[in-house]
């Protein structure tokens, strides 16, 4: 199965650590879950007993982008049989890096980051938050 690959070099968090967060992803049943890079998550405050790790759930179209982050964990693969970035997923319970979206920041994701795996075909087409925090074109 191919997972989303994200490019973040034009995000402010690349050079400005204040625009980065540490998060742990939870599913709709409030259980720790695996999450792909490129997913937009809603930050729900710090986890109990944690000073730096925030609780995150998949964002929806009604969420305020100011309360969200874009998942972009560091692709470290412990399974030597896996060699491609599209084989990487952030495992359940893992603390993951997230980028706070700011005005004029740009990032890109592979087609797997879009709802239904369909990337926009027109230049300048508007996108939003879709199902499970994926990008909806």
Task: List PLM regions with ranges.
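Surface-exposed, low-hydrophobicity beta-strand/loop segments enriched in small/polar/acidic residues
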Residues: 1-137
């Amino acid at each position: 199965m191919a997972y989303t690959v994200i490019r973040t070099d034009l995000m402010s968090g690349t050079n400005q650590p204040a625009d980065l967060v540490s998060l742990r992803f939870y599913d709709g049943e409030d259980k720790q879950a695996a999450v792909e890079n490129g997913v937009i998550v809603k930050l729900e405050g710090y986890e109990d007993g944690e000073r730096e790790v925030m609780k995150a759930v998949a964002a929806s179209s009604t969420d305020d982008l100011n309360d969200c982050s874009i998942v972009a964990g560091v692709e470290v693969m412990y399974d030597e049989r896996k060699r491609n970035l599209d084989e990487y997923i952030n495992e359940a319970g893992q603390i993951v890096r997230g980028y706070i979206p700011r005005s004029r920041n740009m990032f890109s994701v592979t087609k797997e980051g879009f709802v239904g795996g369909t990337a926009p075909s027109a230049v300048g087409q508007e996108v939003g938050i879709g199902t499970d925090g994926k990008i909806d074109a």
